[in-house]
Amino acid sequence: MAAVSLSVSTVKPLGDRVFVKVSASEEKTAGGILLPDTAKEKPQVGEIVAVGPGKRNDDGSRQEPEVKIGDKVLYSKYAGTDIKLGTEEYVLLSEKDILAIVA
């Protein structure tokens, strides 16, 4: 099997899935204490970098996604599949797991 080179530009989500670049988590507490990786909360905010074509309805038509590339979103804590490309972290999740668009 040939090796596949993954990059953000080669990932095309299917159906109602979106590919989100995870925002960096806090390294320190408000009091200045450095947090080890095991104590950090999983980030729930990120920027959409790719969007699938949308969910298929019962009649076969596509439902347009409510989000677009560049939107900053808040998503469910345990949603999606975590993916690391180089030094950046991403999550591939279903549009239904997005809770809000952050202005």
Swiss-Prot record:
Which InterPro entries does its entry note?
A: Chaperonin_GroES (IPR020818), Chaperonin_GroES_sf (IPR037124), Chaprnonin_Cpn10_CS (IPR018369), GroES-like_sf (IPR011032)
Tagged with keyword Magnesium: no
Please classify the protein's predominant subcellular localization into one broad category: cytoplasm
- Keywords for this protein: Chaperone, Cytoplasm
Q: Where in the cell is it found?
A: Cytoplasm
Question: What's in the GO CC field?
Answer: cytoplasm
Top-rank taxon of the source lineage equals Bacteria
Q: Which GO terms describe its molecular function?
A: ATP binding; metal ion binding; protein folding chaperone; protein-folding chaperone binding; unfolded protein binding
The record ties this protein, via Pfam families, to: Cpn10
Q: Which GO terms describe its biological process?
A: chaperone cofactor-dependent protein refolding
Function, as annotated, reads: Together with the chaperonin GroEL, plays an essential role in assisting protein folding. The GroEL-GroES system forms a nano-cage that allows encapsulation of the non-native substrate proteins and provides a physical environment optimized to promote and accelerate protein folding. GroES binds to the apical surface of the GroEL ring, thereby capping the opening of the GroEL channel.
NCBIfam families with a match to the protein in the record? PRK00364.1-2, PRK00364.1-6, PRK00364.2-2, PRK00364.2-4, PRK00364.2-5
Stated family: Belongs to the GroES chaperonin family.
The protein's assembly and partners: Heptamer of 7 subunits arranged in a ring. Interacts with the chaperonin GroEL.
* Protein known as: Co-chaperonin GroES
**Organism of this sequence:** Cyanothece sp. (strain PCC 7425 / ATCC 29141)
